[in-house]
């Protein structure tokens, strides 16, 4: 028996090798295998949003004007969610709702599902792009891991939350004022600001902003003067082997300010990664809880005492009254298909009234 030892070589490349060579070639804009998902989905999501905000009304789904064509501006235009009666339908253009009629599909809110789903896969494609490039240049994949935070928030807010509710109708519409309305809705119907997962999200995002500002200022403060350039940007060679700033000086400064300081760059930068990403993950988990209508902090004893004693009121009980007002005033406007009519005597009023 003869055993041949050596590298197997093919006479000609197959289709996979040809595609792999073209997709991963070094060029000005890297394409990669991830680009097959990223570029089409991003193109369709952005294009669908521009189309919807420019031309498509929300009259048939929300009773609203939502396009530039109807007189909206950048802050008030939106791609609105489908009607509540359509529940969780994917609203495919060729589906039973639109039956291939593009105008009818737009009127029913088909552009929202189009933008939401292509947007989600576009974001996932962007994360895969970071994985692919990191692999190609032999980097760790922490950029992609960090980007999972925004993806988790997008998927939880735009997809998982409405899936837990009665339909896509209760997801945010894609517009500035529409997102603000959704935030008010979250507060009024879920008391979102008192939710511990929201608190962790705020701590993560604002904490990351603080860390970013402190880190940037500290590096600028401890730059070595190695060059004779006129300013910071000309004083260094981008290929220099030496450190650009003094970690020792920075450590001494913050040790004197706070009594503690980061002892090495790895721990410092990991902490700057950990704080915002964990905050985003936690807020995404909280939104998943809201999709299931889970409640967080309910201080019932304070509510009972406030109801019995007109002189007792806390910031919590005031906020509960505010939430009741949001629900009573917002539901009738936000869900016109329900024909909700609240008589004056049931609308909430503060104890002072």
Swiss-Prot record:
Pfam families: Photo_RC. Its main location: plastid. Chlorophyll a PD2 binds at residue 198. GO terms for molecular function: chlorophyll binding; electron transporter, transferring electrons within the cyclic electron transport pathway of photosynthesis activity; iron ion binding; oxygen evolving activity. The chain crosses the membrane at residues 41-61, 125-141, 153-166, 208-228, 279-295. It is an enzyme of class 1 (oxidoreductase). Fe cation binds at residues 215, 269. A plastoquinone binds at residues 215, 262. Keywords: Acetylation, Chlorophyll, Chloroplast, Chromophore, Electron transport, Iron, Magnesium, Membrane, Metal-binding, Oxidoreductase, Phosphoprotein, Photosynthesis, Photosystem II, Plastid, Thylakoid, Transmembrane, Transmembrane helix, Transport. The keyword RNA-binding does not apply. It is found in: Plastid, Chloroplast thylakoid membrane. Pheophytin a binds at residues 130, 143. GO terms for cellular component: chloroplast thylakoid membrane; photosystem II. The modification Phosphothreonine is found at residue 2. GO terms for biological process: photosynthetic electron transport in photosystem II. The keyword Aminoacyl-tRNA synthetase does not apply. Its EC number is 1.10.3.9. It comes from the Eukaryota. NCBIfam families: psbD. HAMAP family: PSII_PsbD_D2. PSII is composed of 1 copy each of membrane proteins PsbA, PsbB, PsbC, PsbD, PsbE, PsbF, PsbH, PsbI, PsbJ, PsbK, PsbL, PsbM, PsbT, PsbX, PsbY, PsbZ, Psb30/Ycf12, at least 3 peripheral proteins of the oxygen-evolving complex and a large number of cofactors. It forms dimeric complexes. Belongs to the reaction center PufL/M/PsbA/D family. 2 of the reaction center chlorophylls (ChlD1 and ChlD2) are entirely coordinated by water. Photosystem II (PSII) is a light-driven water:plastoquinone oxidoreductase that uses light energy to abstract electrons from H(2)O, generating O(2) and a proton gradient subsequently used for ATP formation. It consists of a core antenna complex that captures photons, and an electron transfer chain that converts photonic excitation into a charge separation. The D1/D2 (PsbA/PsbD) reaction center heterodimer binds P680, the primary electron donor of PSII as well as several subsequent electron acceptors. D2 is needed for assembly of a stable PSII complex. This is Photosystem II D2 protein. It comes from Solanum lycopersicum.
